[in-house]
Amino acid sequence: MLSNTSILPPSFFFCLVLYYGCLWYISGPRMRARGFRLPPGPPQMFLTGNLHDLSTKARTEPWLTFTAWSRAYGPVVYFRVLNQKTVLLNSGKVALDLLESRSAIYSDRPTFWMGELAGRKWSVFLISSLEPRFRLFRRLLQNGLNPRASKSYRPIQTQEAQILLQGLANSPRNFASHIRRVPQLASRLRGTRPYWIEFLPILRFVPAWFPGAGFKRTTFEIGPKLSQTEDIPPEWAQEQIATGNFIESFTSKHLLGLGDVKILNQSSPDDIKWCAGALYVGGGDTTVSALKSFVLLVALHPDIQKRAQEDIDSITPNRLPTHDDFDSLPFIRAIVKETLRWAPVAPLGIPHRVIRDDIYENYFIPKGSRVIANIWAITHAEELYPNPGAFDPSRYLPGDHKFQPDPFKFVFGFGRRVCPGAHLAEMSLFLNMASILAVFKISKDVDVNGVEIEPEIAWTTGTTRHLKPFRCQIMPRSKEHLSLLG
C-alpha cells in the first residue's frame, strides 16, 4: 500500500506506530460515551488498525476492495490506518445525503502532506474549505466556467479537436499520445500508492538526506516544476493579449476583467494563476482518460459505433460536428455519459474531510475523518444501473426500461467540491467523440493472419486512472470522410 522508495529504520516506525496507537486509544472513550457506534468495517488490529488489509489488490484497485467491503458491511464502512480514520460511502444515496445535503460540514479536504511539502497548499483541489480563499476560488471558477461563459471557449475546443483529428489521420498508432497533451507532474506527487507521510505526518520533519526520505526529494523536484507549469496559462494569455489577436480563454477573460466585477475586484493575479493552473494541470485528466476509454469501448462495440455514425451522418453529412449539434445528437451525448459511468476517471474522487462529529443512520462519524465516495461502486450498482458491466448508452434514452440516473450526479464530485468545469468537460468530450466518429472507424487490431486481437483492459493506479496502452485500428471511414478535415 505504501511507497517503498527506501526503508526507514524499524525502530523509528515502531515508535511512531506506538504514538499514533495511543492517540487512537485515547479518542475511543469519546466515541463510546456518546452512545453511538462507528459504522461497520473490517476487523482492526490494536495499534495499526486496518493496515494489514491494504494488500496488493487494495493498493492497485482500491475501489474494488472497498466495493467488496460494502457487500460485507453495508453502504457506510469505517476503517482505520494508524490514527487516520476513513469513512467509505458506497451508495449514491449515502453520498448525496452526506456530501450534498450536509455539504457545510463535509466539504473540507484532509491535509495532503506531499502536496504541502511541494508548495501545493493553495491548490484548488486541495485547499481547505475553511480558508477564505476557497470561496474566492469557487466564485472565480464559476464565473469563468458556467455554461454561458463556456460558450466563449468553443473556438479553442474546436481547434484542439481538429489537432486531434489530424494527429489520428497522420499516425493512428500513436492515438494515446495525440489524446494526451496535458502535463502529468501532479500525479507523481500522489504516486501509484500513498506515501508513509500521509499516515505519519510527523515524517515531514525528517531531513531530506535521511534514509527513507525519498518522498521529500520527490516534492523538492516536482514542486518547482508544477509552479513553472502553472505559470504557462497567464504568461501565454498575456502574450496573446499583447498581440491583439487572441482567442478568449479562462485566463484572458479574467486578466481583461471580464465577468463579475465584484469577484474580479476581490481576486489577485495569483488567485487567477492558481485557478487557471488547476484547469491546465488537472482539469484535462477527465477528458484524456475518458477519450482513451471511449476509443476502447467503441472498438469493442461496433454496433454502437455504427449507430452513432448513422446519427452523425444524418445531421452533419458534409461537415464535422460542432457544439451547435449538441441537442441534435442525443446518442452521442449518451455515449459521453455511459463512458464516464462505465469507466469513471476518478473511481474514488478526492477525499473529503468532516469538520465536526456527525451522526448518520445511528452511526457516529468522528470529526476529522476522511470521507471517500466510492464512485466506481455507485456507477456500477445494479439497483441504479441494471447490468452495470455492459456498455449501453441507450440506458439514458427514452424507452421501455427502468429510469437510470444521470451519472454526472456522481462522477464530477459532490456538494461544494463538485467540479465547476463539468459542463465544459461534457462539451469537450461531446465534440471530440462526435468528430472522431464522423471521420474514423475504430476496430480491434488484427495479427499477421488477419485474426482479431482482443485488447487487454488494464488500468493505471492513482487518484485518476487511465487505460494502459492497448492496440486497436483507427482508419478513415472513406476518402470523403477524411476530406472533412480540410
Q: Whereabouts are the PLM-identified features?
A:
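Cytochrome P450 heme-binding "Cys pocket" and the immediately downstream C-terminal segment
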Residues: 302-305, 422-463, 475
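Conserved cytochrome P450 K-helix/beta-meander segment immediately N-terminal to the heme-binding cysteine loop
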Residues: 357, 373-400
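N-terminal membrane-proximal hinge/A-helix region immediately C-terminal to the signal-anchor transmembrane segment
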Residues: 2-122, 132, 136, 158-163, ...
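Cytochrome P450 heme-thiolate "Cys pocket" and heme-binding signature region
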Residues: 323, 397-429, 455-461
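Conserved cytochrome P450 K-helix E-x-x-R motif and the immediately C-terminal K′/meander segment
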Residues: 53-67, 72-74, 202-206, 225-228, ...
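C-terminal helix/juxtamembrane-tail motif
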Residues: 1-6, 20, 465-486
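Central I-helix of cytochrome P450 enzymes
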Residues: 187, 222-233, 260-311, 339, ...
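Cytochrome P450 catalytic-domain helical core, especially the substrate-recognition surface
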Residues: 43-67, 85, 112-236, 252-256, ...
